[in-house]
UniProtKB/Swiss-Prot annotation:
<dbReference type="InterPro" id="IPR004517">
    <property type="entry name" value="HisZ"/>
</dbReference>
<dbReference type="GO" id="GO:0005737">
    <property type="term" value="C:cytoplasm"/>
</dbReference>
<keyword id="KW-0368">Histidine biosynthesis</keyword>
<comment type="function">
    <text>Required for the first step of histidine biosynthesis. May allow the feedback regulation of ATP phosphoribosyltransferase activity by histidine.</text>
</comment>
<comment type="subunit">
    <text>Heteromultimer composed of HisG and HisZ subunits.</text>
</comment>
<dbReference type="GO" id="GO:0006427">
    <property type="term" value="P:histidyl-tRNA aminoacylation"/>
</dbReference>
<keyword id="KW-0963">Cytoplasm</keyword>
<keyword id="KW-0028">Amino-acid biosynthesis</keyword>
<dbReference type="InterPro" id="IPR045864">
    <property type="entry name" value="aa-tRNA-synth_II/BPL/LPL"/>
</dbReference>
<dbReference type="GO" id="GO:0004821">
    <property type="term" value="F:histidine-tRNA ligase activity"/>
</dbReference>
<comment type="pathway">
    <text>Amino-acid biosynthesis; L-histidine biosynthesis; L-histidine from 5-phospho-alpha-D-ribose 1-diphosphate: step 1/9.</text>
</comment>
<comment type="similarity">
    <text>Belongs to the class-II aminoacyl-tRNA synthetase family. HisZ subfamily.</text>
</comment>
<dbReference type="Pfam" id="PF13393">
    <property type="entry name" value="tRNA-synt_His"/>
</dbReference>
<dbReference type="GO" id="GO:0000105">
    <property type="term" value="P:L-histidine biosynthetic process"/>
</dbReference>
<dbReference type="InterPro" id="IPR006195">
    <property type="entry name" value="aa-tRNA-synth_II"/>
</dbReference>
<protein>
    <recommendedName>
        <fullName>ATP phosphoribosyltransferase regulatory subunit</fullName>
    </recommendedName>
</protein>
<dbReference type="InterPro" id="IPR041715">
    <property type="entry name" value="HisRS-like_core"/>
</dbReference>
Length: 373
């Protein structure tokens, strides 16, 4: 079906994709819902238009393109590296604006030179916007989830807390609430006395046996939920999390890291200074960050319009490293956003690990910006 009501710059956009060796790909509007519900993040999940097939399979209207493009790549067993471009409608429940709108973008799959691929994604996004919005000064905000993960890991927190904090990356309200819980732990309450005693004892085998007896008494079916072993391990994890306290020094280290907000040209020095002062070894995460900055400079990207903000993330759970957004200087309207998602294709069923990075344009916002010229 031909696309209608495309913005007047659509042909320019398609020409840019061709010049950048990105193959145009189409994906179905009706998508399996499960991948989006599992890994797209809470912000997107609550905006999805859900439906189901005659057989009861959960389906949804396409809420974004990255997951569908990756699924199509896996289905066609196409080799890598491969660059895909897309332009089409997505469907989301939004407070402001239409519930269906056009997005376009590029997904770069399988390039093992991560630094250059990251730099190319930012360069493509800003280069295309510069053509569509001549004379406008662009501003790029850049974050890196891998650096945040390295900081959290270096602090030696239990794995459960690391996962919670990493999951909240980019959502400062949620992150601050979790940090408050770490400073003032809330102990587990409301458990049956016998269960509480067994959890505290650390005797997993006895706890599982007790839970199995209780489940049999109440007629609880494991087919409808978690097994006794899963429940026991979840209770144990909750106890560990509730008893973990972040000391003041570690709390201030995290606060200091999250407050970093510097021009990208100064970011490597700022991160190195932070790590040295805190006595943390950030290892490969810092090396990859520095490599990306060098690649951006070598690619001719104007670093003066890029800022690094340590707390900056994007509300999609599949990002693993670089994240970025592009606006017109002085505006809050995000015109392009993207990042690295190295684990997504494996999660979706790819047999090999495929590194990936990409970005999307919000065409309605670009159109509004062009009209304001």
């Amino acid at each position: 079906m031909p696309l209608i009501n495309l913005p007047d710059f659509a042909n320019d956009l398609i020409a840019e994709f061709v010049e950048r060796n990105a193959e145009r790909i189409d994906t179905p509007v009706i998508q399996p819902a499960e991948p989006f519900l599992d890994i797209a993040g809470e912000d997107l999940r609550r905006r999805i238009f859900m439906t189901e097939s005659e057989t009861g399979a959960s389906l949804c209207l396409r809420p974004e393109f990255t997951i569908p493009v990756c699924l199509r790549h896996i289905e066609t067993a196409t080799g890598t590296p491969k660059r895909y471009a897309y332009l089409g409608e997505v469907f989301r429940q939004r407070r402001d604006g239409a519930n269906e709108f056009y997005q376009a973008g590029i997904e770069d799959l399988g390039d093992i030179d991560l630094s250059n691929a990251d730099a190319r994604a930012i360069g493509d996004a800003t280069g295309i916007l510069a053509r569509l919005l001549p004379g406008r000064h662009l501003a790029v905000t850049l974050g890196d989830q891998a650096v945040f993960e390295a900081v959290v890991q270096a602090l030696g927190l239990p794995l459960g807390w690391q996962k919670r904090l990493i999951h909240a990356f980019g959502n400062m309200t949620q992150l601050e609430a979790l940090l408050a819980s770490l400073v003032s732990p809330q102990f587990v309450t409301g458990l049956d006395d016998d269960i509480a005693r067994l959890v505290a004892s650390g005797d997993e085998q006895a706890l599982v046996a007790h839970l199995e007896r209780e489940m049999q008494k109440t007629g609880y079916s494991t087919n409808a939920g978690r097994s006794a072993l899963e429940i026991a391990r979840r209770l144990k994890e909750k106890l560990i999390l509730s008893e973990t306290r972040l000391d003041d020094a570690a709390f201030h280290v995290l606060e200091e890291f999250l407050s970093l907000d510097v021009p990208l040209v100064n970011a490597s020095a700022a991160l190195s200074g932070f790590a040295d002062a805190a006595g943390l070894k950030l290892g490969n995460a810092l090396s990859r960050f520095n490599g990306r900055v060098a690649a951006l400079s070598n690619a001719g990207v104007d670093l003066s319009c890029l800022d690094y903000r340590a707390a900056f993330g994007r509300p999609l759970d599949y990002y693993t490293g670089l994240v970025f957004e592009v606006t017109v200087e002085g505006s809050t309207a995000v015109l392009a956003g993207g990042g690295r998602f190295d684990r997504l294709l494996t999660f979706l069923g790819a047999t090999d690990r495929i590194p990936a990075v990409g970005f999307s344009f919000w065409l309605d916002r670009i159109e509004t910006e062009r009209a304001a010229a």
